[in-house]
Amino acid sequence: MRKIVHVDMDAFYASVEQRDDPGLRGKPVVVAWRGARSVVCAASYEARTFGIRSAMPAVRAERLCPDAIFVPPDFARYKAVSRQVREIFHRHTDLVEPLSLDEAYLDVTHAKTGMQLATEVAQLIRTQIREETQLTASAGIAPNKFLAKIASDWRKPDGQFVIAPSRVDAFLLPLKVNRIPGVGKVMDGKLAALGIVTVADLRQRPLEELQAHFGSFGQSLYRRARGIDERPVEPDQEVQSVSSEDTFSEDLALDALDPHILRLAEKTWLATRRTERIGRTVVLKLKTSNFRILTRSYTPEQPPTSQEALAQIALALTRRVELPTQTRYRLVGVGLSGFSDVEDGAVQGQLFGQMPPLE
């Protein structure tokens, strides 16, 4: 039986800002550029009490808390702290799979320290993070990645939670299905329409029914409802693609997709910055009202070096590539693929320096 730990830094970007500027401590801090189409990168726990969340439009965050202090992201500083945290991880195991700057999976089945209890390993890691970075982290401990990720949210901030193999069903079955990664608002609504509200409800449905309604994701739902996740922790797995998608409650015409594409371009760009790599190919994904998936891509001579460039290419793909204009669409996605390491200094400065919001 594997011992998997999911470590998630608490309000990471905002916490770094509060650590480095005592004047921000105890105040609602929002890490974001200002602008009509900017999104929140992170919110301090004080800001979260007003309902502010990551990926929320910055203008909405400002409406929710007019007194919030907006701080532009400093990704170079966040990456430096992230490297400190990863060095701590590697003291305990070489099986470390970073998901972003602020979270990672660790397989501690055979911890370097010789510690047998995964809970003790997680506690020591969190203590070392606190002592060496003055930041807090939460952890989930479980037999697989799926359960460990859910568990890491259970005692936030600055806590940890374990799901023992013998307690998987007792923990999982009462959960709302929207706690399953990948089940957003639209999917949650579709499941509710089928009478599926909890994981226990989901487990009652046969695989064939779930696949009929949700395609390949139906198989994932079937397995997650049983606590099954056989994915290994993949050490330092390099990101090959990043994307963001929107599923609509009502199907939209092609010419109504522009604002969604602009917002998704920013979300994808923010996620790309966390990888410290360059994405060279822009990918547009569309799902029609009859569930047909269309993808279009373009690889420019120079990779996109701003969210604006990414958005412009994605928008151009809807206009310059033959698409059925009379068709209505239920999903749009914007992504980057063909990733490589940042080597050119000028490109690195363009990619990871100051990023103005789309105007």
Swiss-Prot record:
Gene3D superfamilies: 3.30.70.270, 3.40.1170.60, 5' to 3' exonuclease, C-terminal subdomain, DNA polymerase, Y-family, little finger domain. It holds the Pfam family IMS_HHH_1. GO terms for molecular function: damaged DNA binding; DNA-directed DNA polymerase activity; magnesium ion binding. Mg(2+) binds at residues 8, 102. The keyword DNA-binding applies. It is an enzyme of class 2 (transferase). This is DNA polymerase IV. It comes from Xanthomonas euvesicatoria pv. vesicatoria (strain 85-10) (Xanthomonas campestris pv. vesicatoria). The gene is dinB.
